[in-house]
Design a protein with these regions (language model features):
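Adenosyl-5′-phosphate
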Residues: 8-222
């Protein structure tokens, strides 16, 4: 397997060039400069230069690793897997009374894979290289080497269609603006840029909508 952003060819090239910074940036929903643009001046002062991706960068810089791929995979094991994908699998399976098991999480298999040379884990732009080779003869080629099919939702279209009012409402939410964290004009521009088709801000708007819903339900504890 390769870390999440390495599934994009451009990010693999970026990792080869600039390591931890490139990988951390690829994981972010918003680039640092885009985040800064929507924060209020007071919030920017309070952050004092802190970046949300700093824990990931620190993990990579301190990883017991031989190269950039090792550092990225180490950070995935410590940060992205437990904090994102495994949590989602656990919660969604338990919500429907299923007990999920991830066989590839066996610690002996993980240790074996971590010890493989980088060119046995990623070959050119192809991830999961060793696993695919190992399964040849067991799985047919059209299954083993078919293009990945992700679980992508059409949120960009939603926010330009049936959810455009929800996007505007989130950008103008009193719950969010009362925190003092955001620049109101910047949030409105972000929503209108997306709705008009000038830019794709779907992921940022989704995060904003989820934050608004969460704070409305749970209250502002900031």
């Amino acid at each position: 397997w390769a870390p999440r952003p390495l599934r994009a060819k451009s990010t693999l090239r970026a990792l080869a060039l600039s390591g931890d910074e490139a990988y951390a940036r690829a994981l972010c929903v918003m680039a640092p400069d885009a985040r800064s643009a929507i924060f209020s001046k007071a919030m920017t002062r309070e952050l004092g230069g802190y970046r949300a991706e700093q824990p990931l960068i620190d993990l990579m810089r301190n990883a017991p690793a031989r190269n950039g791929l090792d550092r990225a995979q180490y950070a995935d094991l410590k940060f992205w897997l437990p904090g994102d994908i495994l949590t989602k699998v656990d919660r969604t399976s338990m919500a429907v009374s299923l007990e999920a098991r991830e066989p590839l999480l066996d610690h002996r298999l993980v240790e074996f894979a971590a010890g493989l040379p980088h060119n046995r884990r990623v070959s050119g732009m192809e991830g999961k290289f060793a696993m695919k080779r190992a399964m040849e003869g067991t799985l047919p080629g059209e299954i083993l080497y078919r293009a990945k099919q992700g679980f992508v939702l059409p949120i960009a279209q939603w926010f330009r269609g049936e959810l455009k009012d929800a996007a505007r409402a989130a950008a103008r939410s009193e719950t969010l603006l009362d925190t003092g964290w955001f620049d109101a004009d910047a949030l409105s521009r972000m929503a209108e840029d997306h709705i008009s088709g000038r830019r794709d801000r779907a992921r940022e708007l989704w995060q904003l909508l989820m934050l608004d819903r969460s704070m409305s339900l749970l209250g502002n504890t900031a």
